[in-house]
Structure formats: structure tokens, C-alpha cells
């Protein structure tokens, strides 16, 4: 959650090929950043439907705004019961990032892609 927040905030300043977020702690009222621009060409989120730490709606809202992939899977915050599923999703993410002709060197909003 906190790692997802930090990764996404950092990706606004550092060019990265992709950001993989697990139940990211977004839209927390007392935190400094409430908007999340990113230079990452690929952003993907995994969030458990039964998460009682970070509201799943926060990931849904961000995915809609950023136009990124969102995987809502069975499980709570740590997703301990869905590790094989998370591994499969992450492997697919890595393959898409590796095979993408897009670059992450141009600034843009989250989810913005270079033309193919």
C-alpha cells in the first residue's frame, strides 16, 4: 500500500518503463499528494476485493482516471490467498513492459501512451 503510493509519486519524477501497484494507498486525505501524474508507459494495479486497509474504490477511481489496467481479485489487503494469481498477473505485466515499443522518457499523465 505505502510502497505503491511511493512508487507512483516517484514515477512522476523518474522515467520508468512500468509501475506495478498492489493495493496502493491513494487518495488518503492527510497525505500530500492527491493527484498522481506518472511518466510510466505502463501502470497496472492489483487489489483485493475484501481489502479492509485501503478501500478498493480508491484503485477503481485511479484506474479510471489513469486509464490503466486494474485487476480486482479475491482476497484481503496482503492477498496471501491469491499469491499464484498475483504472480501470473505480474509475469504478464513484465512481458508487456519488455515487449512494448513505448518509451517512458516523455512526460505525461498516468496512463498516457506513445502512439503505436
What are these regions (language model features)?
Residues 39, 44-47, 51:
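Short beta-strand/loop motif that positions the catalytic acidic residue
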Residues 1-7:
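Gly/Ala-rich beta-loop-alpha elbow adjacent to hydrolase catalytic centers
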Residues 55-63:
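Short alpha-helix in the alpha/beta-hydrolase fold that links the catalytic acid
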Residues 15-27:
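A conserved short beta-strand
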Residues 81-95:
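Post-His helix in hydrolase/transferase enzymes
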Residues 73-79:
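Histidine-bearing beta->alpha loop at or near hydrolase active sites
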Residues 28, 49-54, 78:
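Acidic catalytic loop of the alpha/beta-hydrolase fold
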Residues 29-42:
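Conserved serine/cysteine hydrolase catalytic core
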